[in-house]
C-alpha cells in the first residue's frame, strides 16, 4: 500500500476539533444511553425490513456500510469517527478483519477499548484518540458513519486525498452523513430556506455539534471524485432517519427525570429540541442523510 506525503496539521485546528467533539460526545455516557439502543449507535438506522427494532436496524445500517466495502478476512478496516465501537465489533465478528478506530472523544475511546478487548479473536484491534488528519497508516478499507459533519468544508479535499492515498488500488470507502441543500436546490424542489430553518441549522452546529457544518450530497461526490474516486449513485436514508429520530425522541422523553438527574434540565431540553427539530426538518425534506460509496480505480474496474 502507498503511504501519502504528510501535510502539516495545525495544532490549533486539531485542538479545536478535540474541544468541539468533547463538548458533545463527552456530555455523559449515561445520558446517551437513555435514548440509544443497546448497540450504543448514534447515527441513522436502516429499517429494512420496516418491522425491525431500533437495535436490529442499527445492525442493518452497519451491515449496509460494511457490505459495500468487499471486505475479506485479514484485511484492515479503518473506522473514522468510530463512536462507541459497534461497527468495529461487527466487522471483526462477522467478517474476520483487523480494525482501527479513530475518535476525538475520551468517553468513546474508553468504551471502545472495552468493547474491542471483549472480542474473542486473534485479529488486531485498536482505537486511537486522534483525528484523521494525524493518521497515515496503510489500510485496506475505510468506513465513516456520521463523522463527516464535523470535518469542515475547507478540509474536504485533504480528507479525501488522505483516504485515497492510504488505501490500495482496489480500495473502497463509505461515508454516511447528514446533509443540507443549497438554496438553489431547494428552490428547484419547491422549497424555500426560511429564517426558522436557518436558525435551527445554526442551533445544531453551535449548541449540539459545535464547529460542525453540514455538507450537501453534491459536495460529498465532487470532492471525492476530485481526489480520484469513482462515486456510484448515493443512497438517501431520509425515511430511515425520520424513524430513528422519532424513536430517540420518544425514548428520551420517557426518561426525562433520569436525563435531568444525570445532566441537567437545560441539557435535556436542548437535546429534545434537537431530536424533535431534526425529525421535523427531515420529514419536511429540508435535511437528508446520504450514504456515499467511494471506489479507487481497481475497485471500479
Curated annotation (Swiss-Prot):
SUPFAM superfamilies to which the protein is assigned, alphabetical: S-adenosyl-L-methionine-dependent methyltransferases
Coiled-coil residue spans: none
Subunit and partners: Monomer.
GO molecular function: methyltransferase activity
Similarity-based family: Belongs to the CFA/CMAS family.
GO biological process terms on file: methylation; mycolic acid biosynthetic process
Protein name per its UniProtKB record: Hydroxymycolate synthase MmaA4
Keywords: Lipid biosynthesis, Lipid metabolism, Methyltransferase, S-adenosyl-L-methionine, Transferase
This enzyme's EC code(s): 2.1.1.-
Function: Involved in the biosynthesis of hydroxymycolate, a common precursor of oxygenated mycolic acids (methoxymycolate and ketomycolate). Probably transfers a methyl group from the S-adenosylmethionine (SAM) cofactor and, subsequently or simultaneously, a water molecule onto the double bound of ethylene substrates, leading to the formation of the hydroxylated product at the distal position.
Transferase is among the record's keywords: yes
UniProt pathway: Lipid metabolism; mycolic acid biosynthesis
Gene field: cmaA
